[in-house]
Amino acid sequence: MVKEYKTITQIAGPLVFVEKTEPVGYKEIVTINMPDGTTRRGEVLDSSSDIVVIQIFEGTTGLDKECGVVFTGETLKLPASIDLLGRILSGSGEPLDGGPRIVPDQLLDINGAAMNPYARLPPKDFIQTGISTIDGTNTLVRGQKLPIFSASGLPHNEIALQIARQAAVPGSESAFAVVFAAMGITNEEAQYFMSDFEKTGALERAVVFLNLADDPAVERIVTPRMALTAAEYLAYEHGMHVLVILTDITNYAEALRQMGAARNEIPGRRGYPGYMYTDLATLYERAGIVKGAKGSVTQIPILSMPGDDITHPIPDLSGYITEGQIVVSRELHRKGIYPPINVLPSLSRLMNSGIGADKTREDHKAVSDQMYAGYAEGRDLRGLVAIVGKEALSERDVKFLEFADLFEDQFVRQGRNENRTIADTLDIGWKILAHLPENQLGRIDNKYIQKYHPAHRKGQ
């Protein structure tokens, strides 16, 4: 028998305070029965005292103390089905595309379960994003969690959509899917995401969750968990390789801070909850490959660094949990370069596991190292030129200075719809490395120079 309580004591913003009349669980789902016969859903934020704090998903407009409260005894669940592919849903899993509700094969708890470390397999297969600065110098590996560190006003949304359109595992027999979750976005951004997915045909192999800025903060906490649960279902029940793109983790962390304040928690660094590290880990650690499972879950969380500060708690803590970072540069963006990814502070810690003769190409590591070294030296020389002028440089230094410009203009810069294969990326690398004297290519084995260098290829 379902018990309905009319013990609401206070309504404040998105929160409803209810007098406790029975044991209530943390994160338990609550149904609010409205006087007009409609219902709203909420989630228990705090049940430690005699008053239960409930955050309402749809907001509290129109609620009063006469509304009925039903504690369901359940946590939030995702209606999981292969029919999720091709759908656009709200942050709490409700259809936004005008389609029918999902008829579930299973109802899955969105909080998931911890993955046994012994059951994990080390990531080792290359994922091609079609973006040279990622594939060539900061390679994404299947099962990895590789965040993109961006900032306000930079084109991280465009980069996210380009990856969603182009990502693939070359040579794999398993199907590839993308789960895209956007948190705290404006209506304009939501329309942009939806139209891009539909227009480019990427929606056919994608599940999209959109949480708007004017949606309740509790839904922002739920959205990435919905997305990851959908990804795990597709990976482990249907053997798919799933790439999860989460944007923007900063909005998620702001919602965490808001929820912490609502519960009167003692704040940690810059007002964020002391448990934010653990909470972020519950998201990031759901990436991986499990022994015996055909599928895998790979993550690209995107976060905008407040004030361009890489030491801010959100990127700082994310960096401890994840396996590298892709850094989006305001300097390159000002130059009109897209995608404005700065390879020097960027890093993929698992890159060496996913490249080489049987995965990408035998010369990949050497070309990447040589381009990185050449670009770093060219950038240093720009600082010197600003002081002493270009005329003071040696002929060798001028070559490296010009190499840095070529690297940005030909390797980093590419079209928003340009999908480069790994062979294209490495060939562009060789093309710009040919600008340097051969005796300066000290990081590349001579056999690769003889095989791939444009000067020697012409003679073959």
UniProtKB/Swiss-Prot annotation:
- CDD domains assigned to the protein according to its UniProt record, in alphabetical order: ATP-synt_V_A-type_beta_C (cd18112), ATP-synt_V_A-type_beta_N (cd18118), V_A-ATPase_B (cd01135)
Pfam family name, one: ATP-synt_ab_N
Tell me the Gene3D superfamilies matching this sequence: 3.40.50.12240
Record has Chaperone as a keyword: no
For biological process, the GO terms are: proton motive force-driven plasma membrane ATP synthesis
What cellular component terms from Gene Ontology apply here? plasma membrane; proton-transporting two-sector ATPase complex, catalytic domain
Q: Does the keyword tRNA-binding apply?
A: no
Locations listed in the record: Cell membrane
HAMAP family from the entry?
Answer: ATP_synth_B_arch
Family statement? Belongs to the ATPase alpha/beta chains family.
* Name of the protein in its database record: A-type ATP synthase subunit B
